[in-house]
Amino acid sequence: MKQSQMLIPTQKEAPADAEVLSHKMMVRAGYIYQVSAGVWAYLPLAYRVIRKIEQIIREEMDKAGAVEMLLPGLLPADLWKESGRYEAYGDNLFKLKDRRERDFILGPTHEETVTSILRDAIHSYKKLPLVVYQLQDKYRDEDRPRYGILRGKEFEMLDGYSFSADQAGLDQAYDLQAKAYRNIFDRIGLDYKVILADSGTMGGKNSQEFSAPAAIGEDVIAYTDGDYAANLEKATTKFTPTKQIGEEAELTKKATPGAHTVDEAAESLGLEASQILKSMVFLAKFEGEELKPVMVLMRGNDEVNETKVASYLGCEELLMASEEDTEKYLGAHPGSLGPIGVKEDVTILADQHLQGMINMALGANDDGYHYINANFNRDFKVDQFGDFRTVQEGETAPDGLPIKFTNGIEIGHIFKLGTHYSEVFGATVLDQNGRDVPMIMGCYGIGVSRLLSAISEQNADENGLVWPQAVAPFDIHVIPVNAKKEDQMAMAEGITANLEEAGYEVLVDDRKERAGVKFADADLIGVPIRVTVGKKAGEGIVEIKIRKTGETLEVHKEELATNIAILLKQTAE
């Protein structure tokens, strides 16, 4: 492919609003163009990368027994209203009306649609298990699109769905998809971690997330040097209950004027923050019910993990109580809250690390006052102990090793959805005993377009992009130093033809530009191997440069293909 025939609008400077390396380099290298905030055009180079990623995905999906289909991006809102997600998605959902005032959405995902199709198409267990997938654009009305294509309003995804007649079928499909995802990311050349994750608005109980470590990642991964890895919302520590040691002292109420935080209360009482019992109040939203107040207790130096609390309660949404709410239910404002004397309609949850603690300090539900020497059972009761805290770096993970933190970009997610959607839409089959049973579902997704950002973040340098060979837009970039010199152009065309005949994808820079411009653009574009045809063209000698390492070597044109094959194999390892 001649570079003069390609649309590659390289730039010397990055956009002023570009915050991260991948955004800067993909714009500068002419891969993407911003049409609007959060809306991007994928120019020819980027689209070539996407097509290669798609091909790897299709090959691995075929191996896993999944079949490709294509669902509409424009979806009737009725399906989403039926599932309850029309409201649950909130402002992130693109909503529109047709000319007859019927409600539609632009699909961010397709559980409702595919379940309704399978409901009408499959009626017997004999047609199951079945796994379908698609590669399609999704839409999400992001409040703050950022980081280029990493978080946009339109993005391409692989989304797959499995349907089984029993749990064994779901487990098998889930495991096959998990293996396929690992194969996909391995082939692409990404560094990634498979982590335990929360299912969020997708529903279901079991899920794994595939995350690519990167400084700009919006997820925090808690991991060890062993096998343990989880996102911060799901991460746990190795916990051993402690027995109560010492005697319970007399409950005493003390004035703590101006103490509105744990640290201020600790200073006022002459205690450590860990000796303060922190009381956080939430309102839990359950389907068809009024908001229910929930108090969560934990050590003053710990943080409440709202995802864990919501998961334990099984609520649709967990809201932080306002000052008005806390005054309504507890008669006090934040900073003076505690579990002693609360109304019976307030559910009290306590983090498991509080077990065994005695003579704690806590809010008295009276502004400006705290209790000291408060104890479980004697002074107040809790409805349930559990893991409701956010882990801290350095703590011991379940595998016995210290927890480390790193940021990560979510690149894939797989869920065991169970029967939630099939029950909502009546997607049932007759089982072996002739009974109607709901199909058991799994859901699987890869952010195809955001993979470009993840790959770029892990591989780019100060000079430009550095693509792994498996997904690079071209295998080789041939650069005649001076396009005006016939011997250089003739040699460049000759080796390009030979390399293409050998099966390589070659970009040849036939532009009448200065050598410095060509080399700078080549570094920006990031093709794995650069072949420079220069002053030694008359001798049949060219220079090979490995983009990843910067190493160079001179070879005779007759040995070029052999050397490139060796180098590409080495760079792929």
Swiss-Prot record:
Tagged with keyword Protein biosynthesis: yes
Compartment annotation: Cytoplasm
Protein name per the record: Proline--tRNA ligase
Quaternary structure, from the entry: Homodimer.
Highest taxon, organism lineage: Bacteria
NCBIfam families: PRK09194.1 (NF006625), proS_fam_II (TIGR00409)
Listed InterPro entries: aa-tRNA-synt_IIb (IPR002314), aa-tRNA-synth_II (IPR006195), aa-tRNA-synth_II/BPL/LPL (IPR045864), Anticodon-bd (IPR004154), Anticodon-bd_dom_sf (IPR036621), Pro-tRNA-ligase_IIa (IPR002316), Pro-tRNA-synth_IIa_bac-type (IPR004500), Pro-tRNA-Synthase_IIa_type1 (IPR023717)
Gene: proS
Organism of provenance: Limosilactobacillus fermentum (strain NBRC 3956 / LMG 18251) (Lactobacillus fermentum)
